[in-house]
């Protein structure tokens, strides 16, 4: 193996702004397969760490793959430090996790990482399920999120169903959802962005609610009827990018929502079942 060693000058190492930890598909536009190109469109460097590697989402007639083994997963994280690729790291974002043990491994890595990066932004999308489908991850994942990742996160982006699971509270109206979100806030967890909150069905609107200790901001967007998958992953990619580019939280959330709508409409125009990213106009 030593005879193959070519690259040992760590001063030449590529540097990441963001490490994105979530699913990856060979075919399609979910998880890091949509998040990475979206983040790169924003001019940021991102390293993708897969939690599951799948042929495609389960919404097709064939489906292959599964969770990354713990040994591989921990090795992927460790290798980023061994390559000295995290000197300029600014954020870690997480999405779909394959197993509870991955969540524990990730939390241990993040805890160690924060010693060298005390200002690191950790944003967790606690992917658990939704109102229509119920829980679609392994049953021990919600508790793993509560125990290991939520205490480390500065911000989280649950949907209404996930907020209910994490808090044990009914969140089917706006006031109860806000109260549940506020119950999660702590010295570390500064904000909760509730995605897919109740909106005005008659006016074809959906709401995203930004909850902090000091404020609540309800952002309404047009509702697009579609079965497209990966919109939540795209939203989080745009949100973390906006925050790192200096946007205030409410502005970053608003812009992320607008970008998701733009991508959905563009995809529909091109008659695709998988998200297609149009060029990003500078704002």
Swiss-Prot record:
Keywords: ATP-binding, Kinase, Magnesium, Metal-binding, Nucleotide-binding, Transferase, Zinc. One of its GO terms (molecular function) is hydroxymethylpyrimidine kinase activity. It holds the Pfam family Phos_pyr_kin. Pathway: Cofactor metabolism; pyridoxal 5'-phosphate salvage; pyridoxal 5'-phosphate from pyridoxal: step 1/1; Cofactor metabolism; pyridoxal 5'-phosphate salvage; pyridoxine 5'-phosphate from pyridoxine: step 1/1; Cofactor metabolism; pyridoxal 5'-phosphate salvage; pyridoxamine 5'-phosphate from pyridoxamine: step 1/1. It catalyses: pyridoxal + ATP = pyridoxal 5'-phosphate + ADP + H(+); pyridoxine + ATP = pyridoxine 5'-phosphate + ADP + H(+); pyridoxamine + ATP = pyridoxamine 5'-phosphate + ADP + H(+). InterPro entries: PdxK, PM/HMP-P_kinase-1, PyrdxlKinase, Ribokinase-like. ATP binds at residues 125, 157, 162, 195, 221-224, 231. CDD domains: pyridoxal_pyridoxamine_kinase (cd01173). Its EC number is 2.7.1.35. Its cofactor is Mg(2+). Substrate binds at residues 23, 59, 233. Belongs to the pyridoxine kinase family. PdxK subfamily. B6-vitamer kinase involved in the salvage pathway of pyridoxal 5'-phosphate (PLP). Catalyzes the phosphorylation of pyridoxine (PN), pyridoxal (PL), and pyridoxamine (PM), forming their respective 5'-phosphorylated esters, i.e. PNP, PLP and PMP. NCBIfam families: PRK08176.1, pyridox_kin. This is Pyridoxine/pyridoxal/pyridoxamine kinase.
